[in-house]
Amino acid sequence: MPIAITPEHQDLANSVRSLVARVAPSEVLHEAMETQVTNPPPYWQAAAEQGLQGVHLAESVGGQGFGILELAVVLAEFGYGAVPGPFVPSAVASALISAHDTDAKVLAELASGSAIAAYALDSGLTATRHGPREEALVIRGEVRAVPAAAQASVLVLPVAIDSGEEWVVLRADQLEIEPIASLDPLRPIAHVRANAVEVGDDAVLTNLSMTTAHALMFTLLSAEAVGVARWATDTASAYAKIREQFGRPIGQFQAIKHKCAEMMADTERATAAVWDAARAIDEASPDVEFAAAVAATLAPAAAQRCVQDCIQVHGGIGFTWEHDTNVYYRRALLLAACFGRASEHPQRVVDTATSTGMRAVDIDLDPESEKLRAEIRAEVAALKAMDRGPRKVAIAEGGWVLPYLPRPWGRAAGPVEQIIIAQEFTTGRVKRPQIAIAAWIVPSIVAFGTEEQKQRFLPPTFRGDIFWCQLFSEPGAGSDLAGLTTKATRVDGGWRITGQKIWTTAAQYSQWGALLARTDPNAPKHNGITYFLLDMKSAGIQVKPLRELTGHEMFNTVYIDDVFVPDEYVLGEVNRGWEVSRNTLTAERVTIGSSDSNFLATLPEFVEFVRDGQFDQVAQHRAGHLIAEGHAAKLLNLRSTLLTLAGGPKDRAMPSAAISKLLSMRTGQGYAEFAVSSFGTDAAIGDTDQLPGKWGEYLLASRATTIYGGTSEVQLNIIAERLLGLPRDP
């Protein structure tokens, strides 16, 4: 999924993508690798006619009047096309000037495309004041390896003066510019020298703080980087579909499939971070430094890793000068250099998260929703005024437990109403029944159950009076549910079921279970399966708890020996249970992917641990990565929710939901691994009332999180096959 998620941003992205495909196809890129870059590049006027140079600049200077998020959408498409020339450096430089003064005179030239700008992250420039009133600055020094410096007529450079570091705008004809060989020939670089250049105070961008400047630079460069990463992911996946080895497409091999899926996960995570950082800048948010640091931690690394993996997927041909991977790898490496030292960004993530705090992951709803909010708030207040018993019944009967369900079981709540309900119950401190695994089973009963089944099971489940378990996995059929062997034989009035289930959560506490059994052994693998509602008190059921790594007993083996289940407890059609179970599994994955797990330390808890500890630079670097990754996983869920709110196709929200589940569980494991590794010999303490023992418990428990609800490996297959379109296993 690209940065753009609203219809307007998608239209902008499509327009830019069309331009880039027309003006910078592969043959143009390779020709530019061998020749001197023309200035301005051939596409410059076409881009100006679309208003791209000024998309983020004020209308008063001829710009489009949009924001940094819109510019990020544009730059991501330029990254996807590895467009040669100074467009990206010029856009960043103009954003820096505009942050100082939206009506600065030079911006009109930059918006129209009649001028080109460049900038530097840091420099060796110093300035001293001269004149009777010290009104003049004399600048001396050198700035090394400045992208597009030789193509620019205006340069934005940091200068050390008495009051600290400031940004100045200099004309190219005031400077000595020495072009040098660039690692990326499509983006030339040059050393820049100032030999006693005298400027007035009007050249100083006094309203541009270092925090804002860095946020703009890192966010916009990150936008280009995620475009590069997306190209690498798409290109590797496309090649894996057509390249054959050993008689089948290489994309069918799990090693390649997982590599491509990891590339997509890397790209989506970084994209979410860039999107949020751009929003933070446009909002003038106080946590913009944190958001930009998260983007800078994730995006350039994603671009570099994804292109490296793209080369690997292509094999030898990917290591040739003529292949496009050569162009994109060089762009990824140059971009990484433009971010400065890589360790600085995760350190900034740690510093901001542990001091001013992380950026909130919230949804801002339209003002039109306030009337609905007032109505729901009043209903929640009425519920709060009730005694506990009547309140529980009223919440169940009012459809508040799973409000997205159709009436009378839910409230037929759309996405906006669901969000408001969750917010108001939290704000009003009114607890809804926690129905646990039933939240995965109830949607199937609503969709496929008879009226008698709905009346029998749904009201008490919503009240919390029935506790459910899910009897799907078997010793020989874990993630491969279609391989189950539990057998159901038809008898007078129902079925006799024999088999064994394993990893059944909370079976020892459950009154009822959702059971899959094979009713037609001669049918194809996914057919001949029936979905049963099983009374866990039935004769012939034996539940044996499994003691886990933690010593706790949450999972169970369930032995089913000739258990009778009446026909009235068949859910859906006989032999069509796979269809019913897929509805349950979909509900399960959405739930797991969009909520914190009780097995893991939360991100705020990890940040608190880092804030209270003493760590060396290497550990700080790792902690910053973990915080950035955890925050971005939450952003993936936010983007998925916003896509749902926008009413677009459901499959557009799938990448964020599926990838968030994969990444959140890994990150949770990472929190615990980091903490335990920091305790030294105290990590051996097993007393969970002490901090080392508590985190040791988290570490032990976290190993389950990449297994339950679909193993990480199965999740990677799902991402590769359903989202990238790689061929399924034969």
Task: Pin down the residues of each PLM region.
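Amphipathic, small/basic residue-rich leader segments at the start of a protein or domain
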Residues: 1-87, 344-436, 446, 456, ...
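Glycine-rich beta->alpha junctions and the first turn(s) of the following alpha-helix
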Residues: 2-14, 52, 79-80, 175-268, ...
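C-terminal helix-coil-helix/basic helical segment that borders enzyme active sites and/or dimer interfaces
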Residues: 25-35, 237, 241, 245-248, ...
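Alpha-helix capping/hinge segments and adjacent helical runs
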Residues: 51, 297-385, 407, 411, ...
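N-terminal glycine-rich flavin-associated loop
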Residues: 85-102, 433-452
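A short, Trp-centered hydrophobic/proline-enriched beta-strand micro-motif
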Residues: 113-124, 464-472, 516
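A short core secondary-structure module
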Residues: 120, 136, 140-180, 498-544
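A structural signal for short hydrophobic beta-strand segments in well-ordered beta-sheet cores
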Residues: 127-134, 486-488
